[in-house]
Amino acid sequence: MTVLIHVLGSDIPHHNHTVLRFFNDTLAATSEHAREFMVAGEDNGFTESCPALSLHFYGSKKVLAQAVIAKAKANRRQRFFFHGQFNTSLWLALLSGGIKPAQFYWHIWGADLYEVSHGLKFRLFYPLRRIAQGRVGGVFATRGDLSYFARQHPGVRGELLYFPTRMDPSLNAMAKERQRAGKLTILVGNSGDRSNQHIAALRAVYQQFGDTVNVVVPMGYPANNQAYIDEVRQAGLALFSAENLQILSEKMEFDAYLALLRQCDLGYFIFARQQGIGTLCLLIQADIPCVLNRDNPFWQDMAEQHLPVLFTTDDLNEQVVREAQRQLASVDKSGITFFSPNYLQPWHNALRIAAGEAE
């Protein structure tokens, strides 16, 4: 029997760390198909912190892709589970036959599914990638992303699967301890990545609420982002008074980030695709409603779980926000499909499907 190989094809330390720790701590002991990884980027202590995994690191996305293609050609029974935003060379290999459809299973994280970049090289590449995506052996994704993908590729198998957000189920009831009143605090974006469209989001918040709310913008990740942080700060200060705007430029530890989220009353996410599911889960767990772009299909997942959804096109005010908080507080968090530990069983199923052990 050939063991399934997992591929983290882009050097995205935060996401890669979450996936590797999840597999090491939760899946590796239960399945031999959850232990073998090929990772773009440096070790950064992963080997030491994930002793249950067999990790192989590659200095660039291109070098990793070459290694994957070589393995795929050497053994056509070898199957790969590609996690998230990988790389151009892998799509082209699927398109050219270097990797066969039966070898290629993909967990969609969002970015590689949507065509949002306007650069010429992206616009030229998107049609090729779209054809390649129709050749994958199967996909795993959120309900909204599965729906989006199926409209383009109805013949490809799709299974529900959620990114393994680090969550403590014992915190599901913690929000009840806080009384919410006074000036609203609004979280804008889930990181410092430009995909959050921070400036457009700040303008949208100002248009809805004016300079009457506290605005918190976490921008400590990714690193080496100071020029963009300064740009966002300047745009924010043109709208909000200094005491109402908090731009966080330092990377935060998880517990500190969790504490920050729990001080908020509303999350505001303007991006027109599924991303930031980890932050959304942590906000929902704390009874903090989220404002989504109507083009972000994750609203379908939220609606399926009977969670209130606010949209950027809605007329928002404090009364609307407080009512959404009340509705969230009435939801039994233990039953939410994309919360821990409910997302575990679909992962076990995904491993068996990708490994060829389940129909």
Swiss-Prot record:
One of its GO terms (cellular component) is plasma membrane. It is a peripheral membrane protein. GO terms for molecular function: 4-acetamido-4,6-dideoxy-D-galactose transferase activity; fucosyltransferase activity. It is found in: Cell inner membrane. Its EC number is 2.4.1.325. Catalyzes the synthesis of Und-PP-GlcNAc-ManNAcA-Fuc4NAc (Lipid III), the third lipid-linked intermediate involved in ECA synthesis. HAMAP family: WecF_RffT. This is TDP-N-acetylfucosamine:lipid II N-acetylfucosaminyltransferase.
